[in-house]
Amino acid sequence: PGALQTLDWLNQQRVPCAWLDELGGADAERMASPLPGWIKAQHCTPAPWPAPDACWHALMTLKTGTLDGCVLVSGEPRLLQSGLNAGLWTIGLATCSSLCGVDRQQWQALSAQEQERKRGNATLQLFALGVHSVIDHLESLGDCLADIAQRRLKGEKP
């Protein structure tokens, strides 16, 4: 939830963004089709995740001059590991990740207790992976990016 609104906010803030996936051809195009045109889509890199190649390739496409402040946001553990391997800040998406094992409709049908259990398990697994922050969904990204900015001001590195 909140993905398109968050992307609009990032665009207003002039934050360059890329979409990374491992799909090729028509599948990749179908997955990226709802995204705004200003988002650079990256498909199929020579080395599969968790190699850092996809992240570095995306940063080169975005013409990023430094890794400082670059953030990867995903619910996919292998892509998050790729971001960690590339030296990026990483934010894991708990409730909309493959770690929860349900789609949005199934999630909404779960009891509050079952949602909390799945959210907690996904959060623990994401932190065990080594991500820097975990949020439930993209609607919380602004606050999370502000937190990372404060951590960077204190000298913390990914």
Task: Label each residue range with its predicted role.
Residues L4, D8-V15, G24-G25, R30-V71, ...:
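Asp-based, Mg2+/Mn2+-dependent phosphohydrolase catalytic module
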Residues A18:
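Active-site substrate-binding loop(s) of clan PA
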